[in-house]
From Swiss-Prot:
Its EC number is 5.3.1.1. The gene is tpiA. The lineage of its organism: Bacteria, Bacillati, Bacillota, Clostridia, Eubacteriales. GO terms for molecular function: triose-phosphate isomerase activity. It is found in: Cytoplasm. Keywords: Cytoplasm, Gluconeogenesis, Glycolysis, Isomerase. This is Triosephosphate isomerase.
Length: 19
Protein backbone atom coordinates (compact mmCIF):
# COMPACT_ATOMS: atom_id res chain seq x y z
CA UNK A 1 0.00 0.00 0.00
CA UNK A 2 1.31 3.44 -0.92
CA UNK A 3 0.60 5.90 1.84
CA UNK A 4 1.12 9.60 1.10
CA UNK A 5 2.48 11.39 4.16
CA UNK A 6 3.57 14.94 4.80
CA UNK A 7 7.17 15.13 5.95
CA UNK A 8 8.38 17.69 8.48
CA UNK A 9 9.83 19.75 5.65
CA UNK A 10 6.45 20.01 4.23
CA UNK A 11 7.01 18.07 1.25
CA UNK A 12 4.58 15.34 0.27
CA UNK A 13 6.29 11.96 0.39
CA UNK A 14 4.95 8.59 -0.71
CA UNK A 15 5.97 5.77 1.59
CA UNK A 16 5.46 2.15 0.61
CA UNK A 17 4.01 0.16 3.48
CA UNK A 18 3.83 -3.61 3.09
CA UNK A 19 0.94 -4.42 5.34
Amino acid sequence: MITPIIAGNXKLVNTISEE
